[in-house]
């Protein structure tokens, strides 16, 4: 790392792999971006011992980060670290640059003091691309149970890789579908395929345990003692009570 020179080493059945504490581990426990100490060689020139370095720190679950490209700085939480010319950034087997990192990524970071040695994207992102959005513009899409976004014309959205149920609804039209977001790829969805038969309504039963509470949907007070029929889509909900 200090010289910037790259070397290629080989390992075999007799090679021992160890964590930084000296405990045995498998070769599968070594990942892109790890820093290791390599010692000895057998008669075939293969390494005898490969051990994770105890001279570096690691953070395998970085999500709160930002990159200051102008100053070559990686911010993790409230701490700043230097990005150098020899800092390696990986996504799977690919070497990437800081422009490819987004806030949706989860990183494994290795450093020495305040210098970043390597960054590996452990959970990457892909792109969701919507088409024929006009019927749903101004309403919200839902991806899984954590991602909500207002729909705009033919929008695209960076999304962490994984499997999701995509749901859309507006003015009584809508539906859902299962999608797969793959790292570095674009998943295209035509919202015309999700509008379904409409306009549709859904019955909502409100559970209220505050005496005298009032509920308003789209500015109108409702009787919540029985299920209320509401069209699919975006609505405003207001609850008031004395005190």
Language model segments and positions:
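LysM (lysin motif) carbohydrate-binding repeats in extracellular/periplasmic proteins that recognize
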Residues: 79-91, 220-221
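Short, solvent-exposed S/T- and G/P-enriched segments that are highly enriched in secreted/extracellular
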Residues: 23, 94-96, 146-158, 219-230
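N-terminal beta-strand/beta-hairpin edge segment
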Residues: 15-16
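Solvent-exposed strand-loop boundary residues in beta-sheet-rich modules
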Residues: 3, 145-147, 172-174, 219-221, ...
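Short, flexible, surface-exposed loop segments at domain boundaries
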Residues: 1-10, 20-82, 93-143, 158-206, ...
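Short, solvent-exposed loop/linker segments at beta-strand-coil boundaries, enriched for Pro/Gly
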Residues: 136-138, 147-149, 210-214, 221-223
